């Protein structure tokens, strides 16, 4: 997802982004979370082609292959788990560095994924998706998870804060939420420096 609708488009996209200095990409086996996933052999071909491209450029691009088996609308939880494991191992064999399975939050399920997939496992830390809350970082570490992604969580939290500030300003004419967020002052100063640095970057 995000790189093109066919192999040629995907390779063309990756060719363009490697020179920017990136160290890795995320590639998904669904399109717009369609309940019908991309055929696993076709997806493996995409991974292998990306790996061959990065190798030909003398650069090891980290490929984080995401399977959306748990998003599919059909099948039991066990069937989705089995498909995630099967796809994860296939993607690893095709050249992926790590496997991203989401949304999962049950400790037993996560432990099974770590045990059965022969690759570092990536979990989404985002309680806004699904019915459960992802275990803490220390708990995920104990389960053997190698990488935690915040996904769109940071942006959603930022937009929610902006909405709260705007509502207070509109309804009460006060700035308490904004001022509380910018306290202590050193944090506010650091945030300003980060913002101006991003603005001035090429």
Where would I find each of the regions flagged by the language model?
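Extended, intrinsically disordered, low-complexity segments
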Residues: 151-202
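Alpha/beta enzyme core
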Residues: 1-150, 157, 167-168, 197-201
């Amino acid at each position: 997802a995000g790189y093109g609708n066919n192999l040629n488009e995907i390779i063309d996209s990756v060719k363009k982004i490697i020179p920017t200095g990136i160290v890795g990409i995320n590639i998904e086996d669904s399109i717009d979370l369609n309940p019908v996933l991309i055929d696993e052999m076709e997806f493996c071909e995409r991974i292998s082609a990306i790996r061959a491209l990065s190798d030909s450029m003398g650069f090891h691009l980290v490929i984080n292959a995401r399977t959306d088996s748990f998003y599919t609308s059909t099948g039991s939880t066990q069937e989705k788990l089995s498909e995630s494991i099967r796809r994860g191992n296939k993607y690893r064999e095709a050249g992926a560095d790590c496997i991203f399975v989401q949304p999962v939050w049950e400790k037993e399920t996560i432990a099974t994924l770590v045990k059965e997939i022969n690759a570092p496992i990536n979990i989404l830390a985002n309680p806004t998706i699904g019915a459960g809350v992802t275990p803490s970082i220390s708990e995920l570490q104990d389960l053997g998870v190698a990488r935690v992604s915040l996904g769109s969580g940071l942006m959603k939290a930022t937009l929610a804060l902006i909405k709260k500030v705007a509502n207070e300003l509109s309804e009460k004419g006060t700035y308490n939420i904004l001022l509380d967020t910018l306290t202590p002052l050193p944090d506010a100063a650091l945030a300003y420096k980060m913002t101006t640095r991003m603005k001035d970057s090429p």
